[in-house]
Amino acid sequence: MRIYTLDGKCNLSGVRVKEARLRLGLSQEALAVKLQLLGLQVGQMAVSRIETGKRVVPDFELPLLAEALNVTTDWLLGKENSSEHRE
């Protein structure tokens, strides 16, 4: 399988993941634990690689990231500017 990149990054949402994580005051490890509780088996290193654009974020992971970070998937994808918590 070929992985396509944009400006050397495998995902576009990593910067937003980091922004939301820091806004919530979470460490990468704490975010990994929240994701594990939602059924996504990732560790701190995977979160780091997502944030730096070195890891692909499959479509099934995006809603779980959004839920863990209390944001929308559209915000993670850059389609919304407001990072307000979702209701």
Model-derived regions, located:
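Short, charged recognition helix plus adjacent turn
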Residues: 1-8, 67, 74-87
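DNA major-groove recognition helix of helix-turn-helix/homeodomain DNA-binding modules
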Residues: 54, 58-75
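Helix-turn-helix DNA-binding elements, focusing on the entry/boundary residues of the two helices
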Residues: 17, 28, 44, 59-62
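DNA-binding alpha-helical recognition surfaces that contact promoter or target DNA
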Residues: 15, 19, 33, 49, ...
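DNA major-groove recognition helix of helix-turn-helix
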Residues: 35, 51, 61, 80
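Short alpha-helical DNA-recognition segment
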Residues: 25-50
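A short, Lys/Arg-rich alpha-helix, primarily the initiator
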Residues: 1-24
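Alpha-helical residues within the helix-turn-helix
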Residues: 22, 33, 67
